[in-house]
Swiss-Prot record:
InterPro entries: Atg12, Ubiquitin-like_domsf
Record gene name: atg12
Protein name: Ubiquitin-like protein ATG12
Covalent link (Glycyl lysine isopeptide (Gly-Lys) (interchain with K-158 in atg5)) residue numbers: G176
Bias kind Polar residues: ranges: 15-27, 35-47
Amino acid sequence: MDPSSPQHPSQDSPRPTQNLSAGSRASLSHRPASRKQSSDSTSNNKNAPIPDDEHGADMPLTMSASVVLTSLPRDAHQALADAEAVDKGKVTVRFQPLASAPILKNKVFKISASQKFETVVKFLRKKLDCKETDSVFCYVNSVFAPGLDEGVGGLWRCFKVDDQLIVSYSMTPAFG
């Protein structure tokens, strides 16, 4: 039978229903009956607020009174040691010319991992004998141009190819 027929009015139907007694109205699923408080304890606690936990402190602590660690956990020491070890070594950088950029005689160089990418760009400008007015555009893996303040060690760790940081360069913008 069609649910929108008068015998079975739909839930959203704007049609007036037939005169029904109060007992038959309570049995309709789309008409809420008057709400009674149930004696069931689960329904009484359903809308009750969650009580606050007592932590034993009457007044909030200031930042100067907060707990200070006297030593770091072992795993934190290892994580710090691993992070520092990345920036202590040397990184191999391979320069690749793009478009009509001049080709370097030696394309592979080593640089300290703690240096910023700015050092790589300055070194490349020096090798290419660029004037101060000349532009050099550098891209890692021919994909993106890193910021000058990026660490070479972090770039190498994330984007190395065959343990080398591939830096493509051009005298004109090569990519958007």
